[in-house]
């Protein structure tokens, strides 16, 4: 009887040990799905085996974002991670990063140098909004979309290189960039969002390569220096006010104004007894 009892107890203990071991392993795996921690001046989260920088707590002027933290690839700069870091003057974004999040560097008013290495795919809305010291930016040819207001109100921005990988430029993406003097829209871009370059008052030359089909409302509204614009035959839609308050429009003769092959608008007074369709 004692032997039988010992055998039963041994079996129960063995089963209990096995039953406890499985949940511990599962729990450890689950805990790795979302882990928050700190690495130097970076707060971060681990999600799906990659790192998102959620906040920068330092005050350095020059920052290089690491490509790996805790053995995981740094893939995402979270929304407002560097918001209003007014001491920050230079940032290097490594090729491990695929997304620069919403407002990530907005209102970094001293930021004058940005190096974005090839790897970034999306530059989200307001990413560099109000970076008033930023004078030039080279966007790598891994980027496919520039979202709304991504570089809006970068008032010192004089030069932008848009690569032949970008397919759309979002609403107000470069609005109020008052120092920007020229821009080339590559043939990979299909659409310019509304207000895309609104109130870029120094913008005097715009070259839109064949491939663009749609120019949004007020896209170049208030670009008071804009006198030279090349519009390809690929453009089939130009929305209201796209070229209002530009030198180019002011120099057009009264009557139907064509932008490329599109009858953009009618300038001046319509003839009497004109019937509208």
What are these regions (language model features)?
Residues 41-49, 58-76, 86-99, 109-122, ...:
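Structural signature of tandem-repeat unit edges
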Residues 1-11:
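Positively charged n-region of N-terminal signal peptides that target proteins for export
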Residues 15-36:
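Sec-dependent signal peptide cleavage junction
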Residues 3, 31-34, 80, 118, ...:
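Intrinsic disorder/low-complexity segments enriched in polar/small residues
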């Amino acid at each position: 009887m004692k032997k039988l009892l010992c055998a039963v107890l041994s079996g129960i203990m063995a089963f209990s040990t096995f039953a406890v071991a499985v949940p511990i392993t599962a729990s450890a795996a689950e805990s790795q799905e979302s882990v928050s921690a700190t690495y130097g001046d970076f707060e971060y989260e681990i999600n799906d085996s990659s790192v998102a920088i959620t906040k920068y707590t330092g005050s350095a002027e020059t920052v290089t974002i690491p490509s790996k933290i805790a053995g995981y690839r740094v893939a995402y700069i979270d929304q407002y991670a560097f918001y209003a870091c007014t001491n920050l003057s230079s940032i290097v974004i490594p090729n491990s990063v695929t997304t620069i999040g919403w407002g990530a560097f907005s209102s970094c008013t001293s930021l004058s140098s940005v190096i974005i290495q090839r790897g970034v795919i999306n530059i989200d809305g307001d990413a560099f909004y109000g970076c008033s010291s930023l004078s030039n930016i080279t966007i790598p040819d891994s980027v496919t979309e520039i979202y709304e207001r991504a570089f809006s109100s970068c008032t010192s921005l004089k030069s932008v290189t848009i690569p032949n990988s970008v397919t759309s430029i979002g609403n107000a993406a470069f609005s109020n960039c008052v120092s920007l003097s020229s821009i080339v829209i590559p043939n990979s871009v299909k659409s310019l969002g509304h207000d895309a370059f609104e109130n870029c008052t120094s913008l005097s030359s715009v070259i839109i390569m064949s491939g663009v089909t749609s120019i949004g409302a007020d896209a170049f509204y208030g670009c008071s220096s804009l006198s030279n614009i090349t519009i390809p035959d690929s453009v089939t839609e130009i929305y209201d006010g796209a070229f209002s308050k530009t030198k180019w429009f002011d120099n057009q003769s009264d009557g139907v104004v064509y932008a490329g092959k599109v009858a953009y608008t009618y300038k001046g007074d319509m003839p009497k007894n004109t019937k509208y369709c």
